Regions:
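Short N-proximal segments of mature Sec-exported proteins
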Residues: 26, 43-50
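Hydrophobic face of amphipathic alpha-helices that form TPR/SEL1-like repeat modules
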Residues: 26-33, 62-68
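Terminal, low-structured helical/coil segments at or just beyond the last alpha-helical repeat
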Residues: 3, 65-92
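Structural signature of tandem alpha-helical TPR/SEL1-like repeats
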Residues: 2-10, 38-46, 76-77
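Alpha-helical adaptor scaffolds
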Residues: 1-27, 33
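Alpha-solenoid helical repeat scaffolds
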Residues: 13, 17, 46-49, 83
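Short helix-capping/linker turns of helical repeat alpha-solenoids
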Residues: 17-21, 33-35, 40, 54-57
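Inward-facing hydrophobic residues that define packing positions of alpha-helical scaffold repeats
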Residues: 41, 48, 63, 79-82
Length: 92
């Protein structure tokens, strides 16, 4: 399977503003498990970090679990991408 999940900034914004950071966490689970999308721990890491930015700290252990499997520079790059997604969604 070589698919990417289709989610818009408006969708993310609604999840954040309506207080549904668990939905963003579920999006990360889809990538981590390869459920309907191509499995990617890096993409899962991004969405778990977006969930953290949205206030969902139940993903802290998942971020702590995946983080050490990535290089420091990769973690920084992916974390920066997550912050960018979060801030763009709020401005959208």
């Amino acid at each position: 399977m070589n698919t990417q999940a289709n989610i818009t900034l408006s969708d993310i914004r609604m999840m954040i503003l309506c207080g549904y950071p668990l939905s963003i966490e579920e999006y990360g689970h889809c990538y981590y498990d390869g459920d309907g999308v191509t499995r990617s721990t890096e993409e899962a890491y991004v969405w778990y970090r977006v969930a953290q930015w949205a206030g969902n700290h139940s993903v802290d252990s998942l971020v702590d679990y995946i983080g050490p499997t990535l290089t420091t520079s990769k973690c920084l790059k992916l974390s920066s991408r997550a912050k960018h997604i979060y801030t763009r969604a709020l401005r959208h």
